[in-house]
Amino acid sequence: MNRSIINIIDGVQTSDGAGVKLRRIIGGPDLNMLDPFLLFDEFGSDNPDDYIAGFPPHPHRGFETITYMLNGKFRHKDSAGNEGLLSDGSVQWMTAGSGVIHSEMPEKTDGLVRGFQLWLNLPKKLKMIDPSYSDIPSDKIPEVDIDNGRVRVISGTYNNITGPGKPHTGVLYFDVELNQSESIEIPIDDFWNTFIYVYSGQACVGDHNILQGQLAIFSQKGLLRFSSSASSVLQCIVVSGETINEPVAR
């Protein structure tokens, strides 16, 4: 049995930080949250005016943030003394836990800045753990070559390859690329909430087409299976997480 689509979300154009322009898909008016995910943004522009002001110091508490850079550079600093530089293909994994103040500021580069940020809720018993931070360089993220494309494994396991991300709850996070008219099957635990976000091309699931900039939410049982269209290569983010089923204060 394959998972079916239960909703497709367009997201909204907005800004955050000191005016960084982005598309908010989870955490916006059409999808407040998808347990355990509190927020999912795509940020990106080839115009420095859209992102150069960055995200000055601001507080977080009680969840994890996962920032995945496709292109560009952002420098991280936080109140625990951590500092790191996000660059092409790398990931910043921060556990806010009991509380941390951090900043994410872009460094000037030629061309496009593009990436994603995901907020992962922590269960009540873990909300007051010590803050922690790790940079995952691009060359430490395994890339699984398949006949019809490739899968970057940021967290979770695909084809017996496990990603370097170490969440405190069950989470799968892949960056998938499929050639034209190809398909992929991904085993996922039952009762986990799952979505794919298309950032280039078009995904197909049965009679549904998921366009660039759209997020599709799937049912909670079965195999995740989707295809690319005949007209373009598909690039998408695949995320699935163990539900927490606890109230969230927003």
Give the role of each language-model region.
Residues 1-250:
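Jelly-roll (double-stranded beta-helix
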